Amino acid sequence: MRRITAAYLDLQKDLHARFDYGRGVDAEECAEIVRTLGVQSVLDYGCGQGHLARLLPEFETEEYDPCIEGKDGDPARADVVVCADVLEHIEPDLLGNVLLHIYALARRHVLLVIATGPSKKVMADGRQAHLIVESAEWWKGKLAGLFEIECCEDRSDQGHGVLMLCKPRRFEIRPLVPIVRVRSTAAVTDAERNANMIANSTRIEKRLRCCA
């Protein structure tokens, strides 16, 4: 499942090469919140220069950033995924894939900080660095299919965007046609098996449609 295009990856690597990019200006606030959650493991999703991990030496903290060599490998699941100043940079057509990735990695909590205004930084192709500029309400709607929003602090009027603490929703997928145990070697007919597959695929598609 693609989460970034090759051309945009090159643009982001160029931005990351700048000294002032990826400093983690919200890292201290995020670290304070993480300490209140009663967790052991932390994933900094889009870690930039790695300021958050330095602030949380008492936690098992993994760093992931697809634009930084050595930190671009597939991360492990963690009790809390922190994603600060990242989602506004995602290519709009791939936002759903990124949200699904975060959902799959979070055991208990997701802590998000999202800018809701344009960036002062400009990429090499002339675009400002925030590809998605939307309100807090828009982001809440985008997240609702995968996450339960525990708290939301909209600080857009202060130029600080929105901070949200979420829990990943848990879905139970049940087969449409019950699988009946029989004594014959063929416990499930081809028709029943196909019906189950179609039903499960339809349910998953409906659950995740809001993130497409």
Across the structure, where does each feature detected by a protein language model lie?
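Short glycine-centered segments of the SAM/dcSAM-binding site in methyltransferase folds
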Residues: 108-111
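A short His-aromatic
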Residues: 89-90
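A short beta-strand submotif of the Rossmann-like class I SAM-dependent methyltransferase core
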Residues: 80-86
